Amino acid sequence: MYIEKIRKVKPLIHHITNYVTVNDCANASIAIGASPIMADFIQEQEEFSKICNCLVLNTGTINERVANSMYESAKFYGNLNKAIVLDPVALGVSMARDAINLKLLNSYKISIIKANASEIASVIGLDGKAKGTDNTFVVNDHFLDKACEYAKGHNRILVVSGEVDFIISSEKIAKIYNGSIMATKITGAGCMCASMCGVFAGVIEDKFQASLQAMLSFDIACEMAEEISNGSGSFRVNLIDALSNLNDEDVKKRAKYEII
């Protein structure tokens, strides 16, 4: 139902993302059925906000020029009440990076935050103790309580990626048990997750459901790719193949999650 809708609608997903994984994000978006636009030129942001279904922001290789484009774009998408996904990469690592991410979080209508547990901990007011882009934080009951409080206070969905993924709203939490350890052996897996959230949010009004379906789809594609891969190189290629061949029946049959 959801993937079929994506392939029928072909939503335009505007990315302002990092230059390490921009190609992965574009190919993953195309594979699942969307049309990515990778545009960070500040003078274009208003025009793209009018034609695109969703905005995905990733601060992995942030600099002042790109940050200003993100602010401009987030302003226009927010004014149009269109979904905005933020991946605050390495939040908590440096003061300059934190300042940019916190401005995005505090000044604009971010719909979905996709990050690892350390980054989300920094978002919700816990000490994330981030180490680069690696996750060093364990999700526990206190973390989940604080995350739900944040989601309620800011009307946002939190997507916590890890060995177990969490989708957190003000009212409910989903735990996803699908996935592959191979996703940690390549660059871009987390960035592609944010892209998937953007794709699904571009066609699904309920952002909790959009985030849940996005992460299930990506995690299941990772499982399918691992089954036929010999290492990280073939896994990367097979992941794009798996996303392009994935359908709603695959997700229904293989989904392993619970709502708590």
UniProtKB/Swiss-Prot annotation:
Pathway(s) this gene product operates in, as recorded in its UniProt entry: Cofactor biosynthesis; thiamine diphosphate biosynthesis; 4-methyl-5-(2-phosphoethyl)-thiazole from 5-(2-hydroxyethyl)-4-methylthiazole: step 1/1
Class of the enzyme per the UniProt entry, highest EC level: transferase
Keywords assigned: ATP-binding, Kinase, Magnesium, Metal-binding, Nucleotide-binding, Thiamine biosynthesis, Transferase
Positions that bind substrate: 38, 188
UniProt-annotated binding residues for ATP: 114, 161
Cofactor: Mg(2+)
Domain of life: Bacteria
Molecular function (Gene Ontology), one example: ATP binding
Documented EC number(s): 2.7.1.50
Function: Catalyzes the phosphorylation of the hydroxyl group of 4-methyl-5-beta-hydroxyethylthiazole (THZ).
Family, similarity comment: Belongs to the Thz kinase family.
Name the record gives this protein: Hydroxyethylthiazole kinase
Naturally occurring in which organism (per UniProt): Campylobacter lari (strain RM2100 / D67 / ATCC BAA-1060)
